[in-house]
Amino acid sequence: MLPGFDIGGRQRATLAAMASTIMVIADEAWARNDVHAALTEPDYTLVDHDNPKTARDAVAADRPAAIVIDLQVANMGGMAIARDLHQHAALNEEDAIPVVLLLDRAADSFLAKRAGVAAWVTKPFSSHDIRTAVEHALAK
């Protein structure tokens, strides 16, 4: 077991007591690490999930302010999670959680638009890119 991780693969990095919780759903450690490096501001508490199925359940429990999802995550995919959240939000606007999608190619931006995400960033991304996308998503 890695330091800071429990058996379920979740890691909590609390950066401030009154921080906005950002959920990061990615099965690749480098993607989660890059998002963490970009969001080291004291304004954010980051919650990681490497399994999209357990992450979907945790969204209701954790109620994050925003979610960052890798497009290619496990066998489910970030698109399916984003679509599920978007459809749920259409039924109950109060439950809408903005999503930032991490894309593999710029050409995938049409997928992000179709999923109804608040913002997207194409890999490889800079810290500035991901910070700007998350701030944009939180402002919606």
Where are these regions (language model features)?
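Alpha4 helix (beta4-alpha4-beta5 surface) of REC/receiver domains from two-component response regulators
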Residues: A80, L101-V121
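Conserved sequence signature across two-component system core domains
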Residues: I25-A26, H49, I67, L102
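Conserved acidic segment of CheY-like receiver
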Residues: A19-W30, V35-L39
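Short hydrophobic/Thr-rich beta-strand motif most characteristic of the beta2 strand and flanking loop
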Residues: D43-N51, A58
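His-Asp phosphorelay/catalytic-motif detector in bacterial-type signaling
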Residues: A90-P98
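C-terminal output helix
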Residues: F125-V134
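The C-terminal output helix
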Residues: E135-K140
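Conserved phosphotransfer microenvironments
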Residues: I69-H88
